[in-house]
């Protein structure tokens, strides 16, 4: 009996030493796969149905339309108008992809298109808008990112539909694409315009 317990003991010790490593690897793999499978656009915004943040942001200096400085973000600008608020940056690759779609949206005068320039250098932001055209009637500069936090932004680009009463009715996480523009964003805009 003592021979069996002696021979089983090293195997048991080895197993007990390897068990935490196996558990760690298993948890790491589970975390990795779950992390990659999440869709951030499915995370509901706590701001839906609530008033848009009372955020005042300075204009992007030097950005002009018809030889007039494009105004910054003023909370009063949302009252009585349906607005599409896009949080963007020149360093954001998906922002470059969605820029032509925003330019097309900017032609629709039934609503105002507002831009929040997030943690960007002014020269780069102006160059970005010069390259694609400025679709925004207002561009507020959020140099430190605090205003975007108030809007519930955790990455760029993000787009919000704000109703006439100044309440957020929809939030799109990620870039505007032809698919989500047609299937989600435009229907949300039409609903807000009624």
UniProtKB/Swiss-Prot annotation:
Read off the SUPFAM superfamilies from this record.
Answer: Thioredoxin-like
> Which positions fall inside the Thioredoxin domain?
46-190
Disulfide partners: 92-95
The record's InterPro entries line, in alphabetical order, gives: Periplasmic_diS_OxRdtase_DsbE, Redoxin, Thioredoxin-like_sf, Thioredoxin_CS, Thioredoxin_domain, Thioredoxin_ResA/DsbE_sf
One GO molecular function term of this record is:
disulfide oxidoreductase activity
Q: Which domain of life is it from?
A: Bacteria
Q: What coarse category fits the chief subcellular location reported for this protein?
A: periplasm
Query: Its GO biological process terms?
Result: cytochrome complex assembly
Q: Which family does it belong to?
A: Belongs to the thioredoxin family. DsbE subfamily.
NCBIfam families hit by this protein: dsbE (TIGR00385)
Protein name (record): Thiol:disulfide interchange protein CycY
Q: Which organism is it from?
A: Bradyrhizobium diazoefficiens (strain JCM 10833 / BCRC 13528 / IAM 13628 / NBRC 14792 / USDA 110)
